């Protein structure tokens, strides 16, 4: 249901972008994301999936005629809007899901996934905090999942630390 709701607003915003109109995200969409973030009964892995915006490729499948520039612009704008609207919630969930040691267990995998989803949104939020969180996670990562999530977040959000992270990773 959440993905269907998102698809509707993504299509609407791609059309608005193409017409030079301002993009919109109704309050109830952010509220739905907030409810997922704060619901302690949802498996963290499932929450991470629900909170992840569709990829540009998935969005392109919604259209007969594909406008990649509009799709990327809308996806980034929605990410930034959600990052701003839910900054406190993303940060709280990010911090609450820090693990002491790497273990290959379902519960830990889910927490890592949710934490990394939150990091990606946080990367599109307040720049100084984003740069600090991403750099810290990259340097403290004891597994490839967390290191790559930090690297991907820095690149996607075009953070100042992205070049250093990319050089360190190669």
Predicted regions and their residues:
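Long, ordered, helix-rich scaffold segments
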Residues: 2-167
């Amino acid at each position: 249901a959440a993905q269907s709701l998102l698809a509707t607003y993504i299509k609407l915003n791609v059309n608005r972008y193409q017409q030079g109109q301002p993009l919109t995200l109704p309050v109830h969409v952010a509220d739905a994301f907030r409810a997922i973030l704060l619901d302690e009964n949802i498996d963290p892995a499932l929450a991470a999936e629900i909170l992840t915006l569709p990829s540009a490729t998935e969005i392109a499948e919604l259209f007969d005629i594909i406008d990649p520039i509009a799709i990327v612009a809308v996806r980034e704008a929605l990410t930034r809007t959600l990052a701003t609207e839910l900054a406190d919630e993303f940060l709280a969930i990010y911090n609450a899901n820090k693990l002491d040691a790497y273990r290959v267990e379902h519960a830990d995998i889910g927490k890592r996934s949710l934490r990394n989803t939150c990091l990606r949104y946080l990367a599109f939020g307040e720049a100084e905090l984003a740069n600090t969180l991403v750099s810290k996670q990259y340097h403290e990562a004891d597994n490839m999942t967390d290191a790559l999530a930090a690297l991907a977040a820095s690149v996607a959000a075009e953070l100042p630390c992205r070049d250093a992270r990319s050089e360190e990773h190669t």
